[in-house]
């Protein structure tokens, strides 16, 4: 079972990218579980046809200790297994702590057991590595390979670099490695070249460039992944390609994060800061 975490700055399209990629893997016949690690609890919506899933933390609050696995895991597109950790009530408690509680509960209830015959588990993790809780999949060896969703925008690259610092911090202890950058295009000038160069400097690869296409939003409005909504659309092939590249990937590195000056000079070199 491969344990994958998808990171990236808030609003970059992690949940969309994760679900569309998982749909591609499921279409290839892979058995996948998706663990949403975001208080918004939108990491599995498209795989479940828009169903707003009850989160692990909500279920715990309501049911107490009497929680069964089927209470917190739903079957989605092509038998993907979907669960959302959820978060505390706004303004109370720590969302990172919620992830720790949820993943521990999933382990206790046997969600990762061999009987499920999982090929992959994907963790879709909120925003930047802002606190120890959100770093938990990296820190405790829950995830072994990390992919960072970014774009050619300055803050997305800054966040990607910060996440690399988090991976570097825990690489020796947890055995976690960076599998590559996924460029979720925002149509920034020289975007592909800039992210390829950023990847090279960090010591990794840009595993795929996902072109911007409003069809992704159209599929989302219809509460589906692109592959589910229209398997013949060109954008569906982009996600199939990304799924295949992840499935075949053998490049796993300890990243070399850049100094802020290096990052800024990269932005200047490719014209974004001009």
From Swiss-Prot:
Post-translational modifications reported in the UniProt record: The reversible ADP-ribosylation of Arg-97 inactivates the nitrogenase reductase and regulates nitrogenase activity.
Catalysed reaction, written as an equation: N2 + 8 reduced [2Fe-2S]-[ferredoxin] + 16 ATP + 16 H2O = H2 + 8 oxidized [2Fe-2S]-[ferredoxin] + 2 NH4(+) + 16 ADP + 16 phosphate + 6 H(+)
Source organism, top-level taxon: Bacteria
Key words of the record: 4Fe-4S, ADP-ribosylation, ATP-binding, Iron, Iron-sulfur, Metal-binding, Nitrogen fixation, Nucleotide-binding, Oxidoreductase
PROSITE patterns for the chain: NIFH_FRXC_1 (PS00746), NIFH_FRXC_2 (PS00692), NIFH_FRXC_3 (PS51026)
Binding site for ATP: 8-15
Cofactor note: Binds 1 [4Fe-4S] cluster per dimer.
EC number of this enzyme: 1.18.6.1
Ligand binding ([4Fe-4S] cluster): 94, 131
Cofactor annotation: [4Fe-4S] cluster
SUPFAM superfamilies registered for this protein in UniProt: P-loop containing nucleoside triphosphate hydrolases
Gene3D superfamilies in the cross-refs: P-loop containing nucleotide triphosphate hydrolases
Residues bearing PTM ADP-ribosylarginine: 97
A GO molecular-function descriptor: nitrogenase activity
Assigned protein family: Belongs to the NifH/BchL/ChlL family.
Function: The key enzymatic reactions in nitrogen fixation are catalyzed by the nitrogenase complex, which has 2 components: the iron protein and the molybdenum-iron protein.
PANTHER family: LIGHT-INDEPENDENT PROTOCHLOROPHYLLIDE REDUCTASE IRON-SULFUR ATP-BINDING PROTEIN
Name under which the protein is recorded: Nitrogenase iron protein
Organism: Chlorobium limicola (strain DSM 245 / NBRC 103803 / 6330)
